[in-house]
Swiss-Prot record:
The lineage of its organism: Bacteria, Pseudomonadati, Pseudomonadota, Alphaproteobacteria, Hyphomicrobiales. Its EC number is 1.3.7.7. Pathway: Porphyrin-containing compound metabolism; bacteriochlorophyll biosynthesis (light-independent). It is an enzyme of class 1 (oxidoreductase). ATP binds at G55, I56, G57, K58, S59, T60, K84, N225, R226, P249, D250, L251. [4Fe-4S] cluster binds at C140, C174. Its cofactor is [4Fe-4S] cluster. Homodimer. Protochlorophyllide reductase is composed of three subunits; BchL, BchN and BchB. This is Light-independent protochlorophyllide reductase iron-sulfur ATP-binding protein. PROSITE patterns: NIFH_FRXC_1, NIFH_FRXC_2, NIFH_FRXC_3. It comes from Rhodopseudomonas palustris (strain BisB18).
Length: 312
């Protein structure tokens, strides 16, 4: 079976159907978005999507969460959803080829591919995949995500997976890059204790709320990252009901781990590293257990959040 019989679809596909009225069905009034084919449901694995402002540390968070899940004995697949394809390099120690790269190499004849052509084993057995994307300024990243899941299912690579993590490009909340939400049980937002990332988190929370009306995804909470304090995040949470679920401090050793192309679980076991590892393990355990109720938060209007944040 050919997944992409026409490479031009990567540049023109704004949704899975060129009929806009069909695309909007079931996904909210006025929505023109990539739709989830019922045949592409991932199955029994727990699926989490990681969102947040560009540069806030989503890939660092995703990779270390993946390792934490693997340390808890789970079989983990991390899917990078950014054309930069740099989500998994601390796990694999290299920039792996993307799904789009390997499909292009066989002229989009997916039946010629083997699983090892596009899925790579990383640290502690975490399986890694980079979806890639269309050329800059063209096409729809959500279409690529859909085709990636389709390829995984064709090769039966999801059947033995316990946890799937989607690491999603920046703070884009268009139909395309909201596509991982259609597969997810929970969506987590990474934010620092500053105006820009909380402002982005508020808009992402609104996108998650919109998707939750027609899909099973629910907001899981905010992961405070690169933050000594959390007062602004907590102020936002008190106003919206969107709670903070983890706090990862602003440590230089975390920056160094990226430069060393290593996860935090591979760094020298100093007291501060051990504390961060324990926070990741605690968060992974809570995400697996799912004891915390989903967040029914109330995102703010832009003007309201502008007025809320800051020092009195």
């Amino acid at each position: 079976m050919n997944i992409l019989t026409d490479p031009a679809k990567l540049k023109t596909a704004g949704c899975a159907d060129t009929n806009a009225s069909k695309c909007s069905e079931g996904d909210g009034e006025g929505s023109v978005q990539v739709q989830l084919d019922p045949n592409l449901k991932i199955g029994t694995a727990k699926v989490f999507s990681i969102y947040g402002k560009g540069g806030i540390g989503k890939s660092t968070t995703s990779s270390n969460l993946s390792v934490a899940f693997s340390k808890l004995g789970k079989r983990v697949l991390q899917i990078g959803c950014d054309p930069k394809h740099d989500s998994t390099f601390t796990l694999t120690k290299r920039l792996v080829p993307t799904v789009i790269d390997v499909l292009e190499s066989v002229n989009f004849h997916s039946e010629e591919l083997r699983p090892e052509d596009f899925v790579f084993e990383g640290y502690n057995g975490v399986m890694c995949l980079e979806a890639g994307g269309p050329p800059a300024g063209t096409g729809c990243g959500g279409y690529v995500v859909g085709q990636t899941v389709k390829l995984l299912k064709e090769h039966h690579l999801l059947e033995d997976t316990d946890v799937v993590i989607f690491d999603v490009l920046g703070d884009v909340v268009c139909g395309g890059f909201a596509a991982p939400l259609q597969h997810s049980e929970r969506a987590m937002i990474v934010a620092a204790n500053d105006f820009d990332s909380i402002f982005a988190a508020n808009r992402i929370a609104a996108a998650i709320a919109a998707k939750s009306k027609n899909y099973g995804v629910r907001l899981g909470g905010i992961i405070a990252n690169r933050s000594r304090e959390t007062d602004q995040i907590d102020k936002f949470g008190e106003r919206t009901g969107i709670r903070r679920i983890a706090h990862l401090p602003d440590l230089d050793v975390i920056r160094k781990s990226r430069l060393k192309k290593m996860t935090l679980f591979e760094m020298d076991h100093t007291d501060e590293i051990l504390a961060v590892q324990q926070e990741y393990l605690r968060l992974a355990t809570e995400m697996l257990e799912g004891k915390e109720p989903p967040i029914d938060g109330k995102p703010l209007k832009d003007r309201d959040i502008f007025d809320l944040l800051g020092f009195d």
